[in-house]
């Protein structure tokens, strides 16, 4: 058990986003029902952009209304309902709009929703060491346009490495799951993408505005998409004898969120180039990546892919229109005039409308 202390800093200024003209997700009510203890079920749901400011809600369990008066000012409800029986809940907005429902099983676990996962098979490194897989980072997006989030899960092998360490790793995988555990696809990044916390940052968003989210991430020779198609040279192995990858092509790929199909692949910017330009000679600093989604024009989400922070830092923004993955801009601390930004990075970045012009800026470091 651990305790987490938080410093709460008041927000002094809000962004000036024009929500009426922003490309936003088209999500449903998002009702979630979780058994908190043997006697109570907690419900939460979304307050939608389309809801009036004075919207209120009624809650139904198995078709019978259970709240005495409409709920206003909150999207949370605690129901006295003992374990041992299944129940279906429905949240209905009083002033019109989308309803939503969720069910609780008779044997529902306490405090969480169980989603079955398909764990990848164990593997063996070139020198005989075995590895298995752990569920790692995850993101969410509505990949099929039904108004509900799916989960994009990254699988990390047990032999994954920090950039500072030598060693081979098993491949990184991405799975897409519906909330009932249905797996839609699996992407195998292949042996030419090293596994570890710094190597694979991925963005899930509806970049082209078709109502379905895409996945964008770095790929390489041998990456296999969710339909079985291989990117680049399937026979290439760019790993050196220390298990590092210091040569070979790098790509940026946008995947269809519903099928896992690679829809477009371009050369990765910022490229690796000379390792020494990033501050060392063994791909520690050159292979530290960050990524984010940002409304750079105030209307459409862009993917911002970043490389390096201890010495050189390069950020590249991309747009996907459903047909072409286009480079919007590149910021490089090695560009004359940008020298002050060198070495200012960190293990994170933030996105916000800092100057209140309705467009996002990137806070790096």
Task: Give the role of each language-model region.
Residues 24-28, 38-40, 47-52, 64, ...:
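Beta-propeller-forming repeat regions
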Residues 33-37:
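Short, solvent-exposed loop/linker segments at the N-terminal edge
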């Amino acid at each position: 058990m651990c305790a987490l202390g938080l410093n709460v800093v008041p927000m002094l200024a809000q962004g000036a986003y024009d929500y009426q003209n922003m490309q936003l997700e088209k999500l449903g009510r998002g009702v979630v029902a979780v058994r908190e203890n043997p006697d109570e079920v907690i419900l939460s749901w979304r307050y939608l952009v389309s809801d009036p400011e004075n919207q209120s809600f009624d809650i139904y369990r198995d078709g019978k209304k259970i709240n005495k008066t409409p709920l206003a000012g909150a999207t949370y409800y605690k129901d006295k309902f003992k374990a041992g029986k299944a129940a279906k809940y429905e949240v209905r907005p009083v002033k019109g709009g989308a309803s939503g429902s969720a069910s609780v099983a008779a044997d529902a676990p306490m405090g969480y929703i169980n989603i079955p996962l398909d764990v990848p098979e164990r593997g063996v490194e070139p020198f005989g060491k075995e590895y298995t897989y752990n569920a790692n980072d995850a993101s969410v997006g509505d990949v099929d346009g039904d108004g509900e989030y799916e989960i994009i899960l990254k699988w990390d092998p047990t032999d994954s490495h920090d950039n500072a360490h030598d060693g081979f790793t098993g491949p990184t995988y991405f799975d897409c799951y519906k909330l009932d555990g249905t797996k839609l696809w699996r992407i195998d990044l292949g042996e030419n993408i090293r596994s570890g916390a710094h190597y694979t940052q991925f963005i899930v968003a509806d970049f082209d505005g078709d109502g379905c989210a895409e996945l964008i991430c770095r790929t390489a020779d041998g990456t296999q998409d969710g339909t079985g198609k291989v990117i680049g040279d399937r026979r290439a192995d760019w790993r050196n004898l220390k298990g590092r990858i210091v040569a070979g092509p790098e790509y940026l790929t946008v995947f269809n969120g519903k099928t896992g199909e690679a829809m477009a692949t371009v050369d990765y910017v910022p490229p690796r180039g000379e390792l020494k330009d990033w501050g060392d000679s063994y791909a520690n600093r050159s292979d530290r990546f960050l990524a984010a989604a940002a409304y750079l024009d105030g209307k459409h989400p862009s993917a911002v892919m970043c490389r390096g922070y201890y010495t050189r830092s390069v950020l590249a923004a991309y747009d996907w229109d459903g047909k072409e993955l286009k480079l919007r801009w590149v910021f490089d601390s090695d560009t004359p005039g940008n020298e002050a930004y060198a070495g200012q990075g960190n293990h994170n970045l933030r996105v916000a409308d800092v100057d209140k012009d309705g467009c996002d800026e990137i806070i790096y470091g």
